[in-house]
Amino acid sequence: MKFAISTLLIILQAAAVFAAFPISDITVVSERTDASTAYLSDWFVVSFVFSTAGSDETIAGDATIEVSIPNELEFVQYPDSVDPSVSEFFTTAGVQVLSTAFDYDSHVLTFTFSDPGQVITDLEGVVFFTLKLSEQFTESASPGQHTFDFETSDQTYSPSVDLVALDRSQPIKLSNAVTGGVEWFVDIPGAFGDITNIDISTVQTPGTFDCSEVKYAVGSSLNEFGDFTPQDRTTFFSNSSSGEWIPITPASGLPVESFECGDGTISLSFAGELADDEVLRVSFLSNLADDVLEVQNVVNVDLTTADSRKRALTSFVLDEPFYRASRTDTAAFEAFAAVPADGDITSTSTAITSVTATVTHTTVTSVCYVCAETPVTVTYTAPVITNPIYYTTKVHVCNVCAETPITYTVTIPCETDEYAPAKPTGTEGEKIVTVITKEGGDKYTKTYEEVTYTKTYPKGGHEDHIVTVKTKEGGEKVTKTYEEVTYTKGPEIVTVVTKEGGEKVTTTYHDVPEVVTVITKEGGEKVTTTYPATYPATYTEGHSAGVPTSASTPPQATYTVSEAQVNLGSKSAVGLLAIVPMLFLAI
């Protein structure tokens, strides 16, 4: 009888080892779109969500979880390269949690925990891999929703993806793994416009090109995904009478006008028009060196129209990367705790202990995008921190605008044991926020000083002005200079051009009165706008632009106020307190 009981226990333990817990969800999205809409050629991010939240179950420190990966998805594995499925995953503080490996015959991905003799009591995180659709699946797939079934011993997860046709209204680049390298396809659709010349050139590559494998084809009878038929690319969609791909050489004739190829560069030109239903595909092969894990060929495509002018969007940089290893993040777990299997709590693995510590009743002025007639008050009270293993609080207020400051209060009570986060420092009422993070026993302090922004708009509106922002952080002083405000003044239109960080933003306002000075200060001071004594009242056709026919007293300023919106989030990161000035223009 004793033997029978032992046998039963062994069977029960084995069943628990391979159960899905603590995997709570499995998701699949396109890496290109970060959504469930994808091309057949896309990389797919497959995420395994681990969570013990709301459960009293624990996990054996050396437990194994097996997940059957659907045959439609596969790891891309090259000969003589590292297996992309083999990896070790850690907490954000560097504590190893588990390792993974994929059996290419059984199509089973195995997660093995790394703490023999321990019991895992707390686990939160996401392990993800990048996979491709199998060639066998793409040969028979149809556009529309497709469901992927991931099976465990006790549960099946079935995320779905909407497979769509290629966008044949613009140039695109696709890639495909081949033995020893990557095959790239640059597709130019005739429907893109009245094109007479196509110039394709590589800008950079980490590998080399096989010039003998540079080929082209022109096709019109595309499949339902808008693609060249994958079963036999050498038979269909070529302008060769034999139906074969034509290698690109100087002697290959029209439509190839010129061709140059070296180890690291390719340049070629095509002359002649494409019909609206035709697609030109140029194929070239990148060889992979043994130590290259990522190939990203940057290709320029320049198009010329029938009137010999370049298109408005002259150059298209097509830079889809191809990887021989999975793009995963080994720091996958935000929370992890394990205790000895005998039940005596003698050690604890701490992933992160962090808290946002602020001066009580700290006032934050936030003005952005949405306006409110009265101040918006947001109060957030964090719970008492009772878990010494992991706690993180992120408080963020955004998309709120007001003429007056937004009052924002954070109160974080702390326990007094050795695991309690650092207490708030500073004096109540100061305009200084101190952030203290306790992570692995280290302490970090950042001090931010209040910032005053001043923007000056000239009366004439033709000079450039400078705005200087000074920020004091950790004792260092940072100065950022922005080139400010140029006006182009017409009868009823003022165009404001702002250059910041090298980017140019243009906003056009109608019926805007001249502005002399606009000064915005944070810390609770109101926005002051000063207008000149007179305004151009009307403009008459036939007069020179910008010359008023009469003047009058300033119009009454009118403000349009919409309902305030508050977005208050809580995530696993250090708290963020943002201070942004708001500039109001009377229109």
UniProtKB/Swiss-Prot annotation:
Residues 432-531 are annotated as: 4 X 24 AA approximate tandem repeats, Thr-rich. Disulfide bonds join C211-C261. Keywords: Cell membrane, Cell wall, Disulfide bond, Glycoprotein, GPI-anchor, Lipoprotein, Membrane, Repeat, Secreted, Signal. It is a lipid-anchor; GPI-anchor. The GPI-anchor is attached to the protein in the endoplasmic reticulum and serves to target the protein to the cell surface. There, the glucosamine-inositol phospholipid moiety is cleaved off and the GPI-modified mannoprotein is covalently attached via its lipidless GPI glycan remnant to the 1,6-beta-glucan of the outer cell wall layer. GO terms for cellular component: extracellular region; plasma membrane; side of membrane. It is found in: Cell membrane; Secreted, Cell wall. InterPro entries: Zona_CL1, Zona_CL2. Glycans are attached at N239. Residues 563-587 form a propeptide. The keyword Metal-binding does not apply. Residues 1-19 form the signal peptide. A lipid is attached at S562 (GPI-anchor amidated serine). The keyword Repeat applies. Its main location: membrane. Sequence repeats lie at residues 432-455, 466-489, 491-512, 513-531. Putative adhesion protein. May be involved in cell-cell interaction, interacting with other proteins by salt bridges and hydrogen bonds. This is Putative adhesin.
